[in-house]
């Protein structure tokens, strides 16, 4: 809600209906004809995050977004069936992307480890540079 964490979004599980909030955390309780997963994607989208930044910047020198600012967010709300369809599709596709990212991160970690080892061997004298002939 404030500062660097403004716009962070999460879904509160239904088994935590009485979760606590503070003056820096807001909770949106959706009506039954709204899909929480769809609204998670909406609220984390670049379009809405830009709105959050714009609305919070207008309020003070320290970025803050109150409930009135939240009410001013412009979001598309299709029928529940379409919300569910969009959320399911995004869940499936972003899971695939996350799997690829995890593989790439693992590969990058191994390359970074190799680089550190490579540099270490030369700066500690374990290996020497061969002179060109």
PLM feature spans:
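Short, ligand-facing micro-motifs at secondary-structure edges
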Residues: 2-21, 37-41, 50-56, 60
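A short glycine-rich beta-alpha junction/loop motif
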Residues: 5, 18-26, 57-84
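Hydrophobic residues in beta-strands and at strand termini
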Residues: 12, 30, 75-77
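Positions in alpha-helical segments
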Residues: 23-26, 37-38, 71-72, 95, ...
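Generic alpha-helical structural context detector
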Residues: 26, 40-44, 54, 120
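Ligand-binding loop in jelly-roll beta-barrel domains
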Residues: 30-36
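Amphipathic alpha-helical coiled-coil/heptad-repeat segments
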Residues: 76-133
């Amino acid at each position: 809600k404030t500062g660097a964490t403004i716009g962070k979004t999460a879904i509160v599980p239904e088994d935590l209906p009485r979760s606590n909030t503070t003056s820096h955390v807001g909770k949106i309780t959706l009506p039954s004809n709204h899909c929480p997963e769809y609204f998670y994607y909406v609220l984390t989208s670049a379009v809405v995050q830009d709105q959050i930044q714009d609305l919070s910047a207008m309020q003070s020198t320290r970025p803050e977004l109150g409930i009135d600012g939240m009410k001013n967010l412009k979001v598309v709300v299709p029928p529940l069936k379409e919300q569910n369809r969009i959320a399911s599709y995004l869940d499936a596709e972003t899971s695939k992307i996350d799997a690829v990212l995890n593989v790439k991160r693992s590969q990058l970690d191994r390359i970074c480890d190799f680089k550190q080892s490579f540099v270490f061997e030369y700066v500690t004298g374990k290996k020497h540079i061969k002179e060109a002939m």
